[in-house]
Amino acid sequence: METSERLVILTTPSRNDGVRLHIERAVQTHGKNQDLLLKQLPHMETAIETLKGGTGDIVAMSALDWQKYDVQGLSIVGLLSRKEPTWVLVSDDKPEYLEQGALVLCEHELLQRQMKRMRPDLRLERIEETVQRLKAEKDVAELDEEDIWPWVEEQRLQGNLDGFIVPRAIHAGHRMKGRRHTLGLQRDQTESNRERFIPPPLYGFTILVSRQGFPKASVREMLDPSAELAYRLEASLMESIDPKLRPIVGAYIEQRKISTFLKKATEDGDETLLNTLVNPNKKRAVYKSGPRVEMLIETLTSDGTVTAACERIVQPENSQMGLVTLLKEFMDLLSVMTTDHEATKRNIPGMPDSFMEPKPRLMDLSLIHISEPTRPY
C-alpha cells in the first residue's frame, strides 16, 4: 500500500438503494493502494451531520438522498461507476409468460403504466392494497422497513402474489431466491418484441459527498467521469420537468463507446441510428470517433396505451445542447399530444375529409391522480 493520509468514508446500513454494497466493494478494491476506512453510522442524517461537524471525509449516498436531505455546505466530489438502474420483475415466469390476469405488486406509478403497456391484462397492486387484501395490517405494521420486501417475497412464495416489481438493488440486497427478470432499456427482439422500460431517473448512482474544498485528486481513482456527466444531465433534465409529471416520466442518460451503438444498430438494421453516427464533414461515410451520450425520455397514459417518447445521441462535448434540444422536443410533443384538435376548414390535397374534423387529444394527463407510495424505496 502506498503511504497516504487515511480517508474515512461514512456510510449507513443498507437502505434498499445499493449504495452500501457499492461503496463497500469500492473501498475493498481501492483500499489495496490507499488507506481507506469505511465507518458505518445508523442513519443518513447522522452521517451528514457527522461530516459537517468535521469528523470523516466523505459520505456515500444515492442521488435521491442528495435531493432529500439538508446538504448545505457540502459538495459532490464525484461518482462511482453507475450500477444497473433498471427494475426487475421477481416471479417464476418472464413477464410475457405470466398467466392471464396475474396479480403483480408494483409501487411505482411509471412502472405500473409500462407494465400495462406490455400486459394490459395484468392486475397491478400497491403494497397497501396487498396488505388490505390479505388482512395483514397488524403483521406489516410490526415490520421494520428492511423487512417489508422479504415479507412480500414470502407472499409470492405462498401464492398470494404472482410477482412483484422492484429496483434491482432491492432484489440483490435481500438475496431473494425468486428469479428476477430485467425490465430492460432495450427492446428485446427475442421476447415477442418486448417493449423497453425506460426507468425512473437517478437510480443506480452512488455519490461521494464531502465538505466544500475537499481535494478531489485524493479519490480520483475511485471516480467515474462518465457517471458524473450522466448524473448531472439526468438531474438537470428532471429539474426542468413539471413536478406533477416527474412520477410518470422515465429518463435515462448514459455515455457509451461508439462500437456499442454500431453493434446494436447493425443487429437491428437501424439505418437512422447508423446515419447519426456518421461524420457529416466527410464525403465518405466515416463514423465520428469517440464515445456518445445517449438520452432517453418517455411518459405514458394511465392505461399504458399511448406513449410520448424522445431520444438523442450526441457527442459528450455537445451533451448540454443535446439535453436542451431533447427537452424542447419532448415538451413540444407533449403539448401536441395533450391538446384537443379543433376542426379546420383547410383542405389539404390528398388528405381525407376526416382530416378536417375535430379530434380529441391523444394523451390525457390532466385526469391523472398519482398516489404516493406507502413505503419509501
Explain the meaning of each model-derived region.
Residues 47-88:
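Short beta-strand-centered segments that line the small-molecule binding cleft or hinge
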Residues 1-49, 117-371:
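Small-molecule-sensing regulatory modules
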Residues 89-104, 118, 122:
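Flexible hinge/capping segments at coil-to-helix
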Residues 65-66, 110-111, 170-171:
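Alpha-helix capping/helix-boundary segments
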Residues 107-117:
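Secondary-structure junction motif
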Residues 372-377:
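Short "domain-exit" segments at the C-terminal end of structured domains
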Residues 94-98, 111, 213-219:
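Short helix-loop capping/hinge motifs at secondary-structure junctions, enriched
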